[in-house]
Amino acid sequence: RKVTAGNCGKCHVKEYQEFMKSRHSIGWQRMLECGKLMALPKDTCSEKCEQCHNIQFKCDSCHTRHTFSTLEAKTPEACRTCHMGSDHPHYEAYISSKHGTIYTASQSMILKESQSVQSLRSPVCVTCHMPQGIHDMSFGLTRGPAGSGLSYVDRNGATIDDIELAKKREDMLSVCNTCHSLRFAKKTLTIADDMHKNIGAVIGEARDMILDLEKEKQLFPSLGEMTKIPLASHAFILGDLHVYTGKSRMERLFITLTQSAAVTWKGAYHENP
């Protein structure tokens, strides 16, 4: 019998309620709705996609069996398994930033089980994304994927209005302000916002080029000849994440562009030059 997050929630009520507000709690659902992933061979999807997206059902993705250590869950290495790679290089952006460099260089100061992350010289993932130990990892996030053409949405797919986005930004600034001046934090995040916007414009221009090529019947194979999937073929090709199945050369170049873009804008928010 599998132990689910709901089982843990019978005792850890507060943590479970916070988890259910986070995007982690809809990881499996989002995977099933993602045609580009469902189009992959079943064994590939099982071995790759499902190993991270199954976090929707359990707590031991972060504090693993059989110790369920809170210390383990506090470390960047616990996040690394899923939050790395060409499509979402969060760990790489953090660990090679100045924050990550200090963390790596001061491993002799590694946390003891009873300590808090405030004991470290530098912030780790949970310092900013799970302040005070909250289990809603969407804390303070105000930007969606660059070039997606979509406003930032909540876990239910509803667009978050400007008032709520402003509040989330203030929440994140309050975390930055723990170590940095508010002026410095605002300037840094504004620069990252501009980077995100500029990259989105470049991706949008490239996307339009591909669609124009399709209209002119210059895309081989054409979008209409793509592997049958539950989403529209344009969403499959030009959405946030990408796979190489059945792609034309132009689309493969577009995939490379989006991967480079992810490194750039995620690096900006993690203060990685």
Residue ranges and their predicted role:
Residues 1-273:
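Short sequence/structural segments immediately N-terminal
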